[in-house]
Structure formats: C-alpha cells, structure tokens
C-alpha cells in the first residue's frame, strides 16, 4: 500500500485536502480516477483553494474530453490563460494530436512539416502515432514547453481516465524508445536525408537531421529531470477521486498500487457523490443507495487508514461556474456536515 505523509503528531488523517495546501514545496499535483467520478470538478476546486495560498497556479487538462472550459464557463486552449475573476490562477487544455504536429514541425512559426516536401510527412506522423502512449508523451512535451516559458509555483493536472493517466506517468520510457527508433532511422537514412535536404535548401532554419535529434535529446534530458521530481514526495502528489461503488473502488486500488510501483506519492482520496438521506426519510432508493455506499466507504476507511479521505456530498445541481466551484471547493478543506 502507498505510504502517506503524516504531518506533525497527527496520527488521525483529517478528512480534508488541507495537508496538500499546507505542503508548500509541492510543484506537481495530479488529480485522477475512473471516468465520471468528478475529477474535473475536484481539480478545479483544488486549484481554487491553492490560488489562495500560492503565488501562481496553473490548471492543465490532459483529458481529450476537455471539461475545464465547461466547468468555468470560459474557453481555454493550448495556451495558458488567466481564469476570469482570478489574478494568479490560469488554465489550459492540451490537444495531444496538435502537439505531435508541433513536434514534427521545426518550430519556424509557420507550422509546416519539414518532411512534407519529401513525401515523408505522413510516414513520420505514422511512426509517431504507432508508439504506444505517444499521445500522453506528446501531452507532456506540450506541458514542458509551457513550463519552461512560463513560471508557475504549482501545477495541477486534471488527468484523463485512469489508463491514460498511468501511461502518461510512464512517458520518459516512451520517449526514450521513440528516440532510439529515430536514432536508428538517422543512422540508416541520415546521410541520404541530409544530402536530399541540402539539395532542397535544408530544413527550415538551416537545421539538419543531427540538429533535430540533438533537440530531441535535450527534450529527453529535461523530461528525465521532471520525472525525478515526480518521484519526490516533497514535490509531487496524486489525489485520487472515486465514488463509493465497487468498480470505482477497484480502479482506485489498482491505480494506487501502480502509483506506488512508480514511486509516486499519494495520500489523499476524494469520495464524491455521497448520499446523506435525512432520518425518517421515506425515499427507499436513497436509503438503499446510502447503505451500499456505506459498505464501500467502510472498505475505503479500512484499506486507506493512512490516507486523507474526503467525503463529498451528492448535490442537487451541477457544479459549473466560478461561484459554485468556490462553494464546492470549501468542502475540500472544511468537512461536509450533512443536515439533520
């Protein structure tokens, strides 16, 4: 089981995310879980709380479904943009496919594929897409570009559903394999390509294949450095989001085991959509569902006694817009007390 970070003499893990806010050395915070359990709402709310205690916060969606724009009622794209009503909270949504196109281009500002004139653009793109997990790797390549050019004290990831997230965290290996393949191709075809490119004026910016590979190697080194930070519990943590149902609990356990195998810290679980029927309620469905939820909540308490387990209620309306998100975010730091 994953190790929890216990602060001070407090052996009873409080049912909030206050420990995440208090840990001011954190630079990377991932929020993830099974699809449909409220990851985006939780990540947006956590980012709002972080903005109260940190100088600058960046919220990034790596989920192809991109729900940040819907959550805040504001359009976000691949460039970081301040969220309306905040001076230190920005958001962006990454398009993995667009990132691949950017990587294959040389960055001359025109967005043109330098291989297109050789009839090799599609081949290189097919090669990139054929590498398992390359969309997650490209997402992170885009993230690195933003991180190196902009300065944020803490970055919150609204991640894709579990499988994508776990692959996303393995991206250094994926990139190294891709670089090995490109190096092999360069050895075989580099001289020929350089001579052809020379006859055609070379790559945009006067680069050759060797320079392109050097850039890729530089990117790999940067990614290796970030990967080291990911495995440092002082700098990185993963907040699991689930609901009190069998499949979600099973997925959460699998995810925590994998995170532990990657040496990535996780000590917080947010359980969403909990029912708290009033005493004497004649709603049979509510009572039956609460009974089922309680069974899985008890299992969560038993399995993760060294975790901060946050219980969030099922709400009567969608959590969309700044005001509702701020109200929801308060329950992440102040335990919800159901009405009697």
Curated annotation (Swiss-Prot):
EC number assigned by the record: 3.6.-.-
Chain coiled-coil ranges: none
Subcellular location(s) per record: Cytoplasm; Endoplasmic reticulum
Key words, A-Z: ATP-binding, Cytoplasm, Endoplasmic reticulum, Hydrolase, Metal-binding, Nucleotide-binding, Transport, Zinc
Residues annotated as catalytic: 63
A single GO molecular function term of this UniProt record: ATP hydrolysis activity
Recorded GO CC terms: GET complex
Gene Ontology biological process terms in this record: tail-anchored membrane protein insertion into ER membrane
Annotated residues for binding of ATP: 34-41, 245, 272
Positions that bind Zn(2+): 283, 286
Subunit structure: Homodimer.
Function: ATPase required for the post-translational delivery of tail-anchored (TA) proteins to the endoplasmic reticulum. Recognizes and selectively binds the transmembrane domain of TA proteins in the cytosol. This complex then targets to the endoplasmic reticulum by membrane-bound receptors, where the tail-anchored protein is released for insertion. This process is regulated by ATP binding and hydrolysis. ATP binding drives the homodimer towards the closed dimer state, facilitating recognition of newly synthesized TA membrane proteins. ATP hydrolysis is required for insertion.
Similarity comment: family membership: Belongs to the arsA ATPase family.
Protein name: ATPase get3
Higher taxonomy: Eukaryota, Fungi, Dikarya, Ascomycota, Pezizomycotina
UniProt gene name: get3
């Amino acid at each position: 089981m994953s190790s929890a970070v216990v602060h001070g003499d407090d052996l009873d893990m409080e049912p909030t995310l206050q420990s995440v806010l208090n840990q001011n050395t954190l630079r990377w915070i991932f929020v993830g879980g099974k699809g449909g359990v409220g990851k985006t709402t939780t990540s947006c709310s956590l980012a709002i709380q972080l903005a109260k205690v940190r100088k600058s916060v960046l919220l990034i969606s790596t989920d192809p479904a991109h729900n940040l724009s819907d959550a805040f009622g504001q359009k976000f794209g691949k460039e970081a943009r301040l969220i309306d009503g905040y001076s230190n909270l920005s958001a962006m949504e990454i398009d993995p496919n667009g990132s691949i196109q950017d990587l294959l281009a040389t960055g001359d500002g025109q967005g043109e594929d330098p291989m297109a004139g050789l009839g090799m653009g599609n081949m290189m793109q097919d090669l990139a897409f054929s590498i398992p997990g390359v969309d997650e790797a490209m997402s992170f390549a885009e993230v690195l570009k933003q991180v190196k050019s902009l300065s944020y004290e803490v970055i919150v990831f609204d991640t894709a559903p579990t499988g994508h997230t776990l692959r996303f965290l393995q991206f250094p290996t994926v990139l190294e394999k891709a670089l090995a393949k490109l190096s092999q191709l360069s050895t075989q075809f580099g001289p020929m390509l350089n001579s052809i490119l020379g006859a055609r004026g070379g790559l945009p910016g006067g680069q050759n294949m060797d320079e392109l590979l050097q850039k890729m190697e530089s990117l790999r080194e940067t990614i290796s450095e970030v990967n080291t930070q990911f495995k440092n519990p002082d700098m990185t943590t993963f907040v699991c989001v689930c609901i009190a149902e069998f499949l979600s609990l099973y997925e959460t356990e699998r995810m925590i085991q994998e995170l532990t195998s990657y040496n990535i810290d996780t000590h917080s679980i947010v359980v969403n959509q909990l029912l708290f029927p009033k005493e004497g309620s004649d709603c049979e469905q509510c009572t039956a569902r609460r009974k089922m939820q309680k069974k899985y909540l008890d299992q969560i308490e038993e399995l993760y006694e060294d975790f901060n387990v946050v219980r969030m209620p099922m709400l009567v309306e969608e959590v969309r817009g700044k005001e509702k998100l701020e109200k929801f975010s308060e329950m992440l730091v102040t335990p919800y007390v159901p009405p009697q």
